[in-house]
């Protein structure tokens, strides 16, 4: 009896973005798993945007299914994170962009993450299979102390490809498309009269530091509410497998 991870690692096509490789690679009629998890993290050996006292929990399920002419992969996941004493970057994934926005008042932050993935590989001829795959993620992120921020992010990955099987060699090719959007809103709700600084990091900690006054710092400019960010990518990949 094999567990899910063992089967997922048994063939490179099962973890490839080219879902055409699914058909012919799933070694069993079907396998699934579901889990609930909880984690607790404490310690000061952290990066400037991380928490020294946090926890997270979530639910996750994955599945492979094989039929005569079609095979499927699916995944659903939910994750909740709560961290204390957090400041630093106000972006969801610092390091993914060529700039950063940094604030300096520690507070509690929460993040909710939703992930949905699916792939299908189908037989076109005896030697040729096609495939489609989608990976979708949505995140909400918020700080609950001034200077407060709230983020929404969407990450979408699409792939379409094929695999041609020779006697001892499999050749694959697929097209990749990715779209990522994130929007950040900042606000000050408290009436203590305290002033809050922000730093716009343009790279390797060169940039501009300013006093938050309800606008500026690229977060609330004339005609723009919040900081909208958008990335679009297209690409292609080739695969070869020897049997």
Regions found by a protein language model. Give the residues of each.
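Transmembrane beta-barrel strands of outer-membrane/channel proteins
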Residues: 32-40, 74-80, 132-138, 173-179
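Outer-membrane beta-barrel proteins
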Residues: 41-45, 83-87, 141-145, 182-186
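Extracellular loop and loop/strand-boundary signature of outer-membrane beta-barrel proteins
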Residues: 44-49, 100-106, 142-148, 221-226
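Residues that define the transmembrane beta-barrel architecture of outer-membrane proteins
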Residues: 53-59, 110-116, 150-158, 230-236
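Residues on the lipid-exposed face of transmembrane beta-strands in outer-membrane beta-barrel proteins
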Residues: 59-65, 116-122, 158-164, 238-242
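Outer-membrane beta-barrel channels and translocator barrels
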Residues: 67-70, 123-127, 165-167
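Flexible, surface-exposed loop regions and adjacent strand-edge segments
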Residues: 89-95, 146-153, 188-197
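Long, internal scaffold/assembly segments composed of regular secondary structure
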Residues: 208-243
């Amino acid at each position: 009896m094999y567990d899910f991870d063992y089967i997922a690692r048994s063939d490179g096509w099962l973890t490839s973005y080219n879902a055409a490789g699914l058909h012919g690679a799933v070694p069993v009629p079907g396998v699934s798993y579901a889990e609930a998890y909880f984690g607790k993290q404490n310690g000061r050996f952290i990066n400037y945007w991380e928490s020294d006292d946090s926890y997270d929990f979530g639910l996750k399920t994955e599945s492979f299914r094989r039929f005569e002419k079609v095979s499927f992969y699916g995944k659903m996941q939910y994750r909740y994170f709560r961290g204390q004493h957090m400041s630093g970057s106000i972006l969801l994934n610092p390091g993914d962009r060529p700039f950063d926005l940094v604030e300096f008042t520690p507070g509690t932050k929460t993040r909710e993450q939703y992930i949905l993935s699916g792939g299908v590989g189908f037989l076109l001829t005896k030697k040729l299979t096609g495939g489609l795959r989608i990976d979708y993620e949505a995140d909400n992120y918020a700080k609950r102390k001034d200077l407060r921020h709230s983020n929404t992010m969407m990450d979408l990955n699409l792939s379409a490809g094929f695999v041609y099987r020779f006697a001892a060699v499999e050749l694959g090719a697929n097209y990749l498309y990715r779209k990522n959007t994130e929007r950040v809103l900042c606000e000050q709700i408290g009436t203590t009269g305290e002033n809050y600084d922000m730093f716009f990091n343009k790279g390797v900690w060169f940039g501009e530091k300013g006093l938050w006054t309800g606008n500026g710092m690229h977060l609330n400019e004339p005609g723009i509410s919040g900081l909208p960010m958008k990335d679009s990518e297209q690409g292609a990949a080739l695969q070869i497998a020897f049997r």
